[in-house]
Swiss-Prot record:
Keyword Disulfide bond: no
Binding residues annotated for [4Fe-4S] cluster, in chain numbering: C57, C60, C161, C176
EC code: 3.2.2.-
Any one GO molecular function term: uracil DNA N-glycosylase activity
SMART domains: UDG, UreE_C
BP term (GO), one: base-excision repair
Regulation affecting activity: Product inhibited by AP-site containing dsDNA but not by uracil.
Keyword field: 4Fe-4S, DNA damage, DNA repair, Hydrolase, Iron, Iron-sulfur, Metal-binding
Thermal dependence, as annotated: Thermo-tolerant.
Stretch list, region Disordered: 1-29
Gene3D superfamilies cross-referenced by the UniProt entry: Uracil-DNA glycosylase-like domain
Protein name from the UniProt record: Type-5 uracil-DNA glycosylase
UniProt lineage: Bacteria, Bacillati, Actinomycetota, Actinomycetes, Mycobacteriales
Encoding gene (name): udgB
């Protein structure tokens, strides 16, 4: 049973079956390979359409197998809950001034809840910091029906499926990249700041914004660089359990990043 709605769902969740916030229907086209990802992403005319297409993608066999196996086997703590078990679209404003880039959904976090950074400890830290900065309406993000709202921010990732060992292959990253390219195309006119959670997200942000020059700006926590067109990129260590437990990243450090990002993005 879904922990908020009390409805029963199969794991993985079938498109159009009533899951909170499910953007897809049984008729949503399904990308089965890299070429179809590129074609469908390139033709998406709105964030709503793009989210639906992303959420049913089956282009990477290893990722499809893993995300669905996790959804069926489950973690003991969530054995009584349905798992989303599908690709996770971006979440937040359709006209964001601040874009937050991660890496990929967590197996028992977003792969379970269907919303970016929701249902795991990394997300707990992230959303608490976003709330302290006035960028979301609640410090808690537990499921897709909890009423969380974004204040001119969007959270997304370059890989949409939970990968084994939290490590997508280079080929999987490449296959998935048209989804993020399309998302950037649809929101970039509004973006004034990007927060990259980790070095890979930093490199992706530089590519998205078409950063030129040699050498490229290097990732570091608190590093800020100008991407052109009035967009600033901020580096932030990923709020992983390891980084938080070891003190490499602290709540105060997160607060500093998001206060600065909010200021640079011009969010009230």
């Amino acid at each position: 049973m879904h922990p908020k709605t009390g409805r029963a769902f199969r794991s993985p969740v079938e498109p159009g079956s009533g899951w909170p916030g499910d953007p897809a229907t049984p008729q949503t086209p399904v990308a089965a390979d890299a070429a179809q990802v590129s074609a469908l992403a390139g033709g998406a005319g709105s964030i709503c359409e793009l989210n639906a297409l992303i959420s049913v993608c089956r282009a990477c066999p290893r990722l499809v197998s893993w995300r669905e196996e996790v959804a069926v086997v489950k973690r003991r703590a969530f054995a009584d809950q349905p798992y989303w078990g599908r690709p996770v679209p971006g979440w937040g404003s359709k006209r964001p001034r601040l874009l937050i880039l991660g890496l990929a959904p967590a197996a028992h976090g977003a792969n379970r809840t269907g919303r970016m950074f929701t249902g795991d400890r990394s997300g707990d830290q992230l959303y608490a910091a976003l709330h302290r900065a006035g960028l979301v309406n609640s410090p808690v993000s537990v499921d897709a029906a909890d009423g969380l709202r974004a204040n001119r921010i969007r959270i997304t990732a370059p890989v949409r499926c939970a990968p084994p060992g939290n490590s997508p292959t280079p080929a999987e990253r490449l296959t998935c990249s048209p989804w993020l390219n399309a998302e950037w195309r649809l929101v970039s006119d509004h973006i004034r700041a990007i927060v990259a959670l980790g070095g890979f997200a930093w490199q992706v942000a530089l590519r998205l914004a078409g950063a030129s020059g040699t050498p490229k700006p290097r990732f570091g926590h608190g590093v800020v660089t100008e991407l052109g067109a009035g967009v600033r990129l901020l580096g932030c260590y990923h709020p992983s359990q390891q980084n938080m437990f070891t003190g490499r990243l602290t709540p105060t450090m997160l607060d500093d990043i998001f206060r600065e990002a909010k200021k640079l993005a011009g969010i009230e």
